[in-house]
């Protein structure tokens, strides 16, 4: 599965701790992240991560493009709800795209724990089955 990892500045340490704890699960998937978050996770865990621009420079929109193209399966986004973000419209657009395209999105560590356990159990295998069927039928 393709999984995006995003964290606002005040939540980056939480993301590093989370990805360190679940490296054994995340290492089985293709990981994508916004710039600084991806670098910090990779340095801390050794996970291979495709890094986009930082969020304020368009990284959220790059991940959004993957969602719109059917190339993203899950978003783990540790948001900081107590700090105003200069790129908040991009964050809202990303969340909207997840809703439109039925992409699981979690915005805090409690929800991420549920997602990661579901991922390790195979609860999201249905996404891969649908993708394979669409590829055979040639439908988007």
Curated annotation (Swiss-Prot):
Enzyme Commission code: 4.2.3.3
A single GO BP: methylglyoxal biosynthetic process
Family of this protein: Belongs to the methylglyoxal synthase family.
Catalytic activity: dihydroxyacetone phosphate = methylglyoxal + phosphate
UniProt entry tagged with the keyword Lyase: yes
Domain of life: Bacteria
Alphabetized PANTHER family for the sequence: METHYLGLYOXAL SYNTHASE (PTHR30492:SF0)
Residues the record marks as active site: 60 (proton donor/acceptor)
Encoding gene (name): mgsA
Gene Ontology MF terms in the entry: methylglyoxal synthase activity
Protein name: Methylglyoxal synthase
Function: Catalyzes the formation of methylglyoxal from dihydroxyacetone phosphate.
Signal sequence annotation: none
Organism: Oceanobacillus iheyensis (strain DSM 14371 / CIP 107618 / JCM 11309 / KCTC 3954 / HTE831)
GO CC annotations, alphabetized: cytosol
MGS-like domain location: 1-140
Keywords: Lyase
Binding-site residues for substrate, renumbered to this chain: 8, 12, 34-37, 54-55, 87
Residues passing through the membrane, by range: none
Zinc is among the record's keywords: no
């Amino acid at each position: 599965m393709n999984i995006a990892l995003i964290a606002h500045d005040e939540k980056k340490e939480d993301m590093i701790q989370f990805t360190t704890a679940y490296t054994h699960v995340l290492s089985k998937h293709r990981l994508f992240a916004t710039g600084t978050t991806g670098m910090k996770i990779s340095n801390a865990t050794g996970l291979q991560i495709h890094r986009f621009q930082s969020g304020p420079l368009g990284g959220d929109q790059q991940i959004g493009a993957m969602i719109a193209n059917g190339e993203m399966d899950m978003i783990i986004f540790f948001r900081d709800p107590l700090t105003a973000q200069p790129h908040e419209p991009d964050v809202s657009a990303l969340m909207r795209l997840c809703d439109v395209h039925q992409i699981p999105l979690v915005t805090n560590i409690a929800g991420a724990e549920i997602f990661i356990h579901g991922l390790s159990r195979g609860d999201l295998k249905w996404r891969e089955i649908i993708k394979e069927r669409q590829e055979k039928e040639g439908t988007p």
